[in-house]
C-alpha cells in the first residue's frame, strides 16, 4: 500500500492543481480589492508598479514599454480605480488614453467579468481614426486579459458586426454606428453596462453629436461609472446633467500652467492676404523637403483641390490627403502610410485634428483660420507630443488677425508673429491657371473649393474674426487658377434681405427727381400692359364693405367721395338736405305707389316694413339672435355656426360636503391676504407646480422607456425564435423512404391505382423446358396490366413462382 504522503498521479493530480490555482487567484483578487480600498488619493505615483494593478495589466504595460506615469495618469487612474466619475483635462499628447483604459481593464477584472456577463465598458470616440488608435492601444495593454474587445465604426459590414456584438465585453466605437446597433441589433444588450468613457468629450457633447449621444444615453443604465477626457474639457452643467454624472472629480493637471499648449511647441502666425496663401504654402513646402508636415484646411473640397494641384506641380516630397468623404479602407491606409513615413505632407480637414498620434511630426500648418481657440489647440497638438519638439504656423488674413489673437490670449496660447522673406516666395498663380485651362476636372475642383471656403467662413458664429465682406474673393478665385469668381447664392440672398428690410423713407428719397419719375411711369405703363394675375387677396380688397358701420360711413362722405366737413353749420346742412338722398326704393316696391309727402310718414312706413322683415330668435346666449337677412336664416340650419352665438357652458365641481362650485372661483380679499404676501404665494405656487411637473415628467419618461424596452425585447425574442428555427432546420436529417419489401406486405386500397412492381413482373414467367429459356431475358414492354394480389392464394402462387 502506498504511503499517505505519496504524490498523486492522473486525474486527481490535475483536479488538485486546478483547485490550488483557483484558490490562489481568489486570494490575489481579494488582496487586490483590499489594496484598492486602502488607496490614498492624495498620494502621488510615479511608476505603474506603485498602483494597485492586477498582474495581467502590469504584464501588458511592461510588454508595451510603459513604465512611468504622466501627470494626468497619476491623478486620474487612482480616482477611477475607486469607481468615481471623472472629468479629465490635460494638454495634447499627455497620455489621456491610458488614463481611462487602465481603469476599464482593472474594474472589469476585479468583478471577474466574463463573456456571459455582456457588455461591461463602452468607449465613444468622435472619429474613426481615433477609435482605431484607442483599440490598438487596448490590444497592446490588455493582451494578457481574457476579455473580448471589439471595434465598431462605420464603413464596415453591419451583419458581421451584429453576429459578434453580443459576445463583446469592451467596445470602442463611434456614436453613429453605436446608435445604429442599439436600435437594430437584437442580441445586443447594454443593461449590465459598468463604465462609459467619452474621449474628446467636448467634441462629442457639442451640437454635432447632441441627438445621437442623447439617444445612446437613453439606452444605458443610470447606475454606471462615467469618465470624460479632453484637452479642452467642458464644464457645462447641462452637459454633465445629460450624462447623469454623480459628484464628478475634475482632474485638470495643467490648469495653473502658463499656457494651454506644451512648452516644447514653438507657435507662430503669418499675416498674409487671402490670395497669397497658396503661394506661401508652396514656398514653405519647397523649402522643407526633409520634414514631416500636416496642413489643415477648412473643407474636404479644398483638401482635394490643393492635393491635386500640388501633385501636378511635383514639389519633391510625398503628398497625401485625408478627409471625411473617403472610404474607411482608404482612410486607414493613408493614416498608416503617413505614420510610417519619415518625410511627407498630409493635407487634412479637422478629421485628423483630435487625438491622433502621428509619430515625429515636425510642422503643423493651419492654412485656414480655425473656428475657435479650442480647435487651434487640438490642431497644433499633433506635434510636440510626449515632450518632443514641434513647430506650428497659423495663416491669418488681415481681417482675422485681431479677433483670433484675442481668442488665443483668452485661452493662454502664446503666439509670435513672423514675416515671410520676399526672395524665397514663389508664385504658382500662372501655373494653376494653365492647369485649370487644360484640365476641366481640376477647374471644377477649384470652383467647388472656392465655394466651400466661402461657405465655411459664412457659417462661422464668431463674426468678430470671420468677416466675409472684408475678403478679396475675386483675387482669391484668380489665385486658384479660375477665370472668375463663381456665383454664390447665399451672398446674393443677404443682399436681397437687406434691400427688403431697408426703411421706406430711404426707398423714396429719389422720388423727387424727374428722371426717376419718368422711369416709374414707364414701369407702371409696362405693368398695366402686361396681363396681371388677380389673387384672392385682390378680390378681397375689391369687395364692398358689408359691415354694420358701412351706412354710417356713407353718410360721412359727399357724393364726390370727399369727407363731409364736421364743423359745417346747420344752415349748410339744410342746403345740402335739399337734394340729398333720403331713402332708396327697389324697383317694383309698393311703397313707391303709396308715397309720402312728409319725412315722418316715410320714416314711419320704413320702420313698419323693417319690423315686418325682422325676426328675433332666443337661443342660449346673452342676447337674442336677430334674423334680418337670408344669410342669417341659413345660419339657423347650422348647429356648428350657431355655437359662437351661444353662451359657454359652465362646469361645476362638488366638494366633500356635496356643495356645487365653479372650477375657478374668486377668493375674498381677506382670505387671500390671510395666506401671506402675493409674491410669496406666487413663489410657492410656482415651486409646487414645478415639482408636480417634474414628478410627472419622470413618470412619463420612465413609462416611455419601459414601452421602448418592451418593444425591443419583443423584437429580439422574435429574432431569437427565427434563429433557433433556422438552426433546427439545418440539424434535421431526412429519414430514408421505406424499402420495397415493406411495401409488399400490405395490399393497396381499392381507391388507389395498382402500382406495378419489379417483383410482380416475374409472375408472367413459366417453368422453362431448356437452359437457354431459363436464362434471364430483357424485360419487354407489355400492355397487359399486372395481376393484383387480393387473396392469400395469389400471394403463395407469386412466392412459388419466385422460388422457381
UniProtKB/Swiss-Prot annotation:
PANTHER family xref list: RNA HELICASE
Q: Which GO terms describe its molecular function?
A: ATP binding; ATP hydrolysis activity; identical protein binding; RNA binding; RNA helicase activity
Question: What is the scientific name of the source organism?
Answer: Aspergillus terreus (strain NIH 2624 / FGSC A1156)
So what does this thing catalyse?
ATP + H2O = ADP + phosphate + H(+)
Quick one: which gene encodes this?
Answer: dbp4
What's the main place this protein lives?
Answer: nucleus
Protein name, entry field? ATP-dependent RNA helicase dbp4
Q: Where is this motif: DEAD box?
A: 199-202
Looking at the record, the residues that make up the Helicase C-terminal domain are 277-436
Lineage from the top down?
Answer: Eukaryota, Fungi, Dikarya, Ascomycota, Pezizomycotina
Q: What biological-process GO terms show up in the record? A: rRNA processing
